[in-house]
Amino acid sequence: MTFRFLRQIGAFAAASLLCAVPASAQDEPFDEYLESVAMKARSEGVRQSAIDSVFTGLTPNDRVLALDRENVSSSGSGTSTGFPSMAGYLARHNTASRINGGVRKLAQVRSIGAEVERQYGVPAEIIVAIWGHETAYGQVMGGFDLPRSLATLAWEGRRRALFERELIDVLKMVDQGVPRSRLEGSWAGAFGNGQFLPSVYLRLAVDGDGDGSRDIWNSDVDTMHSIANYFRDAGWRTGEPWAVRAYVPNSADRSGIENHVNSPVCPRVHERHSRWLTVREWRERGVEPRSPIADDTMAALFEPDGPAEPGYLLTQNYRVILEYNCSNYYAMSVGLLADEISR
């Protein structure tokens, strides 16, 4: 799931823990709530026929509410960093099956990938790695009815502004010709090979094959173009690696590399990275990249499982992967999967 949106979910969830629980959703009948959304959608130009095709017969989904309330990160087993083991996470997520599937998918889309890389500057293996992590290369896209899920989450009320916007954007998708029957995905409203949200689909999905539809469900071309467009929009730097593994000796000079900047987004993710230095400056401190990278590249040191374990010099492109899902575990697994499938 793209996560600029996940970031918003996390922020709203955290806020909800600090304030009183709002009035029950049942205080406002579901049908009345849908009518209020329909009025807003009409004011934004959505035709009544699209609204009727989506809202007719819609009911709340109790399973979605249960999943939303259970959506709490597990603490996991700690390491010297106080965080769950990155090595353990990678063993569970970058499996032989996922790697082999990525190799096959990359071969299948090789010509598309070359075209996409020329147009957007994003390597095909990065796009395929996202595809693999999000939906197992299209095999698991979710079976929840998207309008029902989004309407339920918006009606429930804790994050109404967030989910109501996505619900209205689903109506816009249908108004623009997306078949109602295609609107299935995750319980939180993400869909398609890349697990876009409706707002992301409307803004960044691409009709890569020129057939008149932005089909991120069935078209490899549209999927590749759309994920690449997301990355370009988020600031991907052409020709720069996402990270390089680095040798960090025990004697490395660690003085003055702490990151004292409090990130306004995902602070617990970014606080684990050092401050930014050039690769040349890292070399002067004894940190040696294991792969080619320009000396003037800005990079942050990240030792996910602590000193004496693998270290990485992260570039700006790592931050772009975080835009898709703001988790060090996710971003590392995507980057390393991309490296594996492109060997």
Features from the language model and the residues they span:
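Substrate-binding/active-site groove segments that recognize
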Residues: 145-154, 167, 191-206, 227
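Bacterial N-terminal signal peptides that target proteins for export
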Residues: 2-11
